Each structure stands twice: as structure tokens, then as C-alpha cells.
């Protein structure tokens, strides 16, 4: 992937973010995203662009995060060095955002740290202080143009109410908001996983028919978007469980 001359760090981050989305949802190949974010970070640091440097560090952190998720879902252990690398990048991004007055950026940085503790350390009590702060700033994320970022915040708060502080109705509410934001964004790669999460929550809440409807949308959309095999399998498994529950 080539980027052409004359781009600044934030433009490079936008290209890197598209490469990351394609890798995380469709190809599993993270090399381009990692290279582009690293190039953007070096450029921003050279130019004294604090916001660009924060954005690039967060992008590198998210690249590591999605790569680590790919290991977890296939049953592989995430090496301690990989956990440490992701956490270091997320901390660096948050520290840089906190040096600016960029509210949406601070929300991104806080959310990234929440992911480290929720997903890698499996520690909701450590994750939620970060997630709650990001939740309080989520509107600023959308106002800055980061609708997907806001969707992710609502998604993980929804997970909290689904599996930790179990309140299925609140989980449904948060995951509905997350899905609506992704539908507004219109990226077909990002909608199926939101349908799956909401379908799973509706099933737990006892709304079996709605769960089946949501998951019957998710499965063909996953195939149409050529998502990664594990993402398609996740949608298909959730649909099978919901249909079994509907049959009683």
C-alpha cells in the first residue's frame, strides 16, 4: 500500500485506520496498518503535532488489540510481551491526549485503556473506571466525526451489563445504541457484529423472537461482507442458539 507524497500525520492515520478496519474484519493482515500508523507517529513527532502523535499511538494500540483478539478467538494464548506492548501503546496514547484539550481524543484514549483491562487482563473492575469516563465523553466523539468510536463505547458498556453487572434490559439499550450508530455509519463490515451482540443480549433478556430476527440479518450480512471466518462462525453459532431457544 502506497500513500503518496505531501500527506500529514492525521491524513496518514485515516488511511491506516481503513487498513486496520479491513484487517480486523476481513483479512487478518495487520502489516499495512501497523506500518502506516508507525509512519504517522514518526511524522507527527517530528512536526510537533501532539494530536497527530496521540492519534497514531492509539492506532498502533488498536492494531495490537485486534491482532491479540484474533489470537484469543482461535484459542491461542496472548504472550505477555504482546499484552505489555498493547498496554504501553494505549497508555502512551492516553497520556498524549491528556496533554491536549481534545475531548474526543481523551475519550478514545480512555476507551483504549478500558479495552486492555477488560479483554487482556479480564478485569472489569479495572476496566470500568476508564469506560465510564469514556462514556461520559462519548457524545464528543461523535461530534468530532468518530461515530464508530462512540458505538464502541456503548458496545462495551453493554457487555458490562450483559456479563458483569447483569442487567439485560440495560445491556439491550446500550447495544441498540451501538448498532444504530454503526447503521448510520453505513460500513457493512461493522454492522454484523453489532447485530450479533444485540441478538445475544435480547436472548438473555428473554426476547427470543427479536434475537432470532437480528441474528438472521447478521449471518447473510457477514457472508456478503466477506468477514473473517471466525466472525461468520460467531454469527452462525449465535443464530443456532437463538433458533434452538425459539423451538423450546
Where are these regions (language model features)?
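Ankyrin-repeat and related helical/solenoid repeat scaffolds used for protein-protein interactions
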Residues: 170-237
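Tetratricopeptide repeat
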Residues: 33, 39-40, 86-93, 112-113, ...
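Structural signature of alpha-solenoid helical repeat junctions
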Residues: 7, 12, 32, 52, ...
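Short coil/turn connectors between adjacent alpha-helices in alpha-solenoid helical repeat scaffolds
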Residues: 19-32, 64-86, 115-128, 161-170, ...
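Eukaryotic all-alpha helical interaction scaffolds
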Residues: 4, 37, 44, 97, ...
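Conserved alpha-helical positions within TPR/SEL1-like repeat arrays
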Residues: 14-26, 52-66, 104-119, 148-159, ...
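Flexible inter-repeat linkers and adjacent short helices
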Residues: 1-80, 219, 228, 235-241, ...
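Alpha-helical adaptor scaffolds
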Residues: 145-176, 180-183, 189
Amino acid at each position: 500500500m502506497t500513500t503518496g507524497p505531501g500527506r500529514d500525520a492525521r491524513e496518514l492515520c485515516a488511511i491506516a485506520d481503513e487498513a486496520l478496519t479491513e484487517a480486523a474484519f476481513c483479512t487478518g493482515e495487520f502489516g499495512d496498518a501497523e506500518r502506516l500508523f508507525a509512519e504517522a507517529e514518526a511524522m507527527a513527532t517530528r512536526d510537533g503535532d501532539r494530536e497527530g502523535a496521540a492519534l497514531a499511538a492509539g492506532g498502533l494500540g488498536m492494531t495490537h488489540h485486534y491482532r491479540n483478539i484474533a489470537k484469543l478467538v482461535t484459542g491461542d494464548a496472548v504472550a505477555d510481551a504482546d499484552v505489555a506492548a498493547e498496554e504501553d501503546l494505549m497508555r502512551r496514547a492516553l497520556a498524549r491526549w491528556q496533554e491536549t484539550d481534545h475531548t474526543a481524543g481523551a475519550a478514545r484514549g480512555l476507551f483504549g485503556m478500558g479495552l486492555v483491562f477488560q479483554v487482556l487482563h479480564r478485569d472489569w473492575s479495572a476496566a470500568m473506571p476508564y469506560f465510564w469516563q469514556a462514556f461520559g465523553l462519548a457524545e464528543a466523539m461523535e461530534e468530532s466525526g468518530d461515530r464508530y468510536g462512540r458505538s464502541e463505547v456503548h458496545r462495551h458498556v453493554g457487555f458490562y451489563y450483559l456479563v458483569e453487572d447483569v442487567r439485560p434490559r440495560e445491556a439491550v439499550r446500550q447495544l441498540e445504541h451501538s448498532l444504530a450508530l454503526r447503521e448510520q455509519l453505513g460500513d457493512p463490515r461493522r454492522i454484523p457484529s453489532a447485530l450479533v451482540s444485540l441478538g445475544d443480549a435480547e436472548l438473555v433478556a428473554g426476547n427470543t423472537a427479536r434475537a432470532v430476527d437480528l441474528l438472521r440479518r447478521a449471518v447473510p450480512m457477514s457472508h456478503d461482507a466477506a468477514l473473517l471466518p471466525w466472525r461468520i462462525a460467531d454469527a452462525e453459532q449465535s443464530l443456532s442458539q437463538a433458533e434452538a431457544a425459539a423451538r423450546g
